From Swiss-Prot:
UniProt-recorded name of the protein: 7-cyano-7-deazaguanine synthase
Alphabetically ordered keywords of this record: ATP-binding, Ligase, Metal-binding, Nucleotide-binding, Queuosine biosynthesis, Zinc
Organism listed in the record: Yersinia enterocolitica serotype O:8 / biotype 1B (strain NCTC 13174 / 8081)
Pathway membership, UniProt: Purine metabolism; 7-cyano-7-deazaguanine biosynthesis
Gene Ontology biological process: queuosine biosynthetic process
Enzyme class: ligase
Protein's job: Catalyzes the ATP-dependent conversion of 7-carboxy-7-deazaguanine (CDG) to 7-cyano-7-deazaguanine (preQ(0)).
Cofactor binding summary note: Binds 1 zinc ion per subunit.
Molecular function via GO: ATP binding; ligase activity, forming carbon-nitrogen bonds; zinc ion binding
SUPFAM superfamilies linked to this entry: Adenine nucleotide alpha hydrolases-like
Catalytic reactions on record: 7-carboxy-7-deazaguanine + NH4(+) + ATP = 7-cyano-7-deazaguanine + ADP + phosphate + H2O + H(+)
Family: Belongs to the QueC family.
Amino acid sequence: MKRAVVVFSGGQDSTTCLIQALQQYDEVHCITFDYGQRHRAEIDVARELAIQLGAKAHKVLDVGMLNELAVSSLTRDNIPVPSYSEEGEDSIPSTFVPGRNILFLTLAAIYAYQVQAQAVITGVCETDFSGYPDCRDEFVKALNHAIDLGIGRDIAFITPLMWLDKAETWALADYYQQLDRIRHDTLTCYNGIQGDGCGQCAACHLRAKGLEFYLANKPKVILSLKQKTGLV
């Protein structure tokens, strides 16, 4: 039986990954992390979506120690979330949570070991991202190798969105006839607003810009998606 664990935040990217995984695996488990994040409403959104979409199980882990160690505008109320216009192109933004994906992927791999899953799926992306170093393909592959050595089992880290831009990610949701669900029911906003979000933070800006481009250029974006992914 093919099993996978999806690192699931209830946002656009991880929900799109879950939708695809449910088509590709016999059994899909979700794992969500509560680290005292500013946009903590995402946890309830993730719970509801996991039920609606039909995940086999959904585990929510308390990793509050990350909040204690990692100083970020997503973990500290006294550090404001910058608007997309305030973020510098060449610097790591204040929304970066140091060590987050190191911890999340490690714990997801342990969970995968427990449920005998062959894959851990994460929605990180290097094409359209906010400059987070732990979203890079190089990082994911390096950590995957280290974890395989450390647990003595091959668990593949799968990154379906790694080389897709946001418009292509919208196209992928549309391919599975889930664009409206992704738009209205997910929570990507750093300020914790479901759907189209606050419209001001970098996450909302990237998401809205991608949707606008996709809706205006559907045939072109769908063709690009199929060329990159092999979907027919």
